[in-house]
Amino acid sequence: MALIDPRAGLSGIAPSSPQARYILPSFIEHSSFGVKESNPYNKLFEERIIFLGVQVDDASANDIMAQLLVLESLDPDRDITMYINSPGGSFTSLMAIYDTMQYVRADVATVCLGQAASAAAVLLAAGTPGKRACLPNARVLIHQPSLEGGIQGQVSDLEIQAAEIERMRRLMETTLARHTGKDPDTIRKDTDRDKILTAEDAKEYGIIDTVFDYRKLSAQK
C-alpha cells in the first residue's frame, strides 16, 4: 500500500494551492445608507449564500466555517445555502466543514453546479434533508480515501498510517451512509473505485433530493 501525509485528500493527492483565476469584478451599490463598493462574493454572503468553488483544503475550509458561524450568529433560524463546484480535497478539511454544517442551528441547503467530487460529494450529501439539489448537468463522484506517494519510516510507522487510512475510510462510509440511507457495506463496495453519478443518479442514490430545472424553463411552464 502506498502512503503519504494524511493531509492528502480523498482524491488521492495532497491538495495544492488554488489556481489563479480571473480578476473578481467589483461594483458600486447605492442605498439609503450611502454608496459602497461590493463584489459577487460579498453580495452572495448578504443573501446567506456560501460558494465553494475551489478544492477543499485548510484555507477554503476556514473560509467556509467562518461564513457558516457568522451567518448563524446573524440569524440562526434562516436557511444558509451552499453552492458547490469543487474537485474535492483534504479529508480533515472536509470533516471540519462537515462538523460545522451539523453544528450550526440554521438549515444548510446544498446545491451542486458543475461537479461535487470526492470530499465535495460528502458535503453535498450532508445538506439538510429535503434541501439538497443538483443542476441538470452537474456530476457527482464518490470514492474511497486514497493516499498516494511514499513515506520514509519504520514498519511501525507504516502500520500507524495504514490504520489511519482505514479509520478515514470507515468514517467516510458511515457519514455517506447516514445521509444517503445506504448501508455502509454498500457504500464501501460502491466507493472501492471511482463511482461517477449524473444528477439523476445522485438523486436515486440519496445524495440529493431534487434536480433543479432551469429557471427560464420553469417560468415558461
From Swiss-Prot:
In terms of one coarse class, where is the protein primarily found?
A: cytoplasm
Q: Where in the cell is it found?
A: Cytoplasm
Family annotation (PANTHER family): ATP-DEPENDENT CLP PROTEASE PROTEOLYTIC SUBUNIT, ATP-DEPENDENT CLP PROTEASE PROTEOLYTIC SUBUNIT-LIKE-RELATED
Q: Assembly and partners?
A: Fourteen ClpP subunits assemble into 2 heptameric rings which stack back to back to give a disk-like structure with a central cavity, resembling the structure of eukaryotic proteasomes.
Q: Does the keyword Protease apply?
A: yes
Q: Which GO terms describe its molecular function?
A: ATP-dependent peptidase activity; ATPase binding; serine-type endopeptidase activity
User: Of which family is this protein a member?
Assistant: Belongs to the peptidase S14 family.
Any GO BP: protein quality control for misfolded or incompletely synthesized proteins
Give the EC number(s) listed in the UniProt record. 3.4.21.92
- Organism source for this protein? Nocardia farcinica (strain IFM 10152)
Q: Which InterPro entries match?
A: ClpP (IPR001907), ClpP/crotonase-like_dom_sf (IPR029045), ClpP/TepA (IPR023562), ClpP_His_AS (IPR033135), ClpP_Ser_AS (IPR018215)
* Purpose of the protein: Cleaves peptides in various proteins in a process that requires ATP hydrolysis. Has a chymotrypsin-like activity. Plays a major role in the degradation of misfolded proteins.
Q: NCBIfam families per the record?
A: PRK00277.1, PRK12553.1
Q: Which PROSITE patterns match?
A: CLP_PROTEASE_HIS, CLP_PROTEASE_SER
This protein's superkingdom?
Bacteria
Catalytic residues of the enzyme: 118, 143
Q: Which UniProt keywords apply?
A: Cytoplasm, Hydrolase, Protease, Serine protease
- Has keyword Ligase? no
In Swiss-Prot or TrEMBL terms, this protein is called: ATP-dependent Clp protease proteolytic subunit 3
- Gene3D superfamilies attached to this UniProt entry: 2-enoyl-CoA Hydratase, Chain A, domain 1 (3.90.226.10)
